[in-house]
């Protein structure tokens, strides 16, 4: 009887540990396809943000959207969602036009040069990027 109780307690502890570990890692948002481009967007909440940042190694381009706010001890980024994003190739063809669902967007693009535009409160920021297949992070930051 004593051995059975120990097994039951061990099994319960193992199940609780596994359950806690699974709860700490949020699932990735769904991958969406637009033409030849696969992307995902999200990162609202610490768990989802950590999950997306961990997955960034599998995407040649990661975008981050933030506004600089002034805190007591210096500027502090405030992450933004619902940011309209347009990616064009150098011929001006739109290869992706979407709105972010969180402060991070991971994009799989063919190798090449692209012009990326992101908008917040009517202010458009543009970046020219060379996608090589190696992971790259672009930060779009607006004044608050």
Annotate each predicted stretch with a short phrase.
Residues 18-21:
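N-terminal signal peptide c-region/cleavage motif recognized by signal peptidases
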Residues 24-83, 121-144:
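Primarily secretory-pathway and cell-envelope proteins
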Residues 102-108:
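Short, surface-exposed beta-strand/beta-hairpin micro-motifs centered on an aromatic residue
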Residues 112-118:
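A short tyrosine-centered beta-strand micro-motif
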Residues 90, 119-121:
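Short strand-coil-strand connectors
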Residues 83-95:
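Short amphipathic beta-strand segments in non-cytosolic proteins
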Residues 95-100, 130:
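Short beta-strand segments within Ig-like beta-sandwich modules, predominantly Fibronectin type-III
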Residues 1-11:
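Bacterial N-terminal signal peptides that target proteins for export
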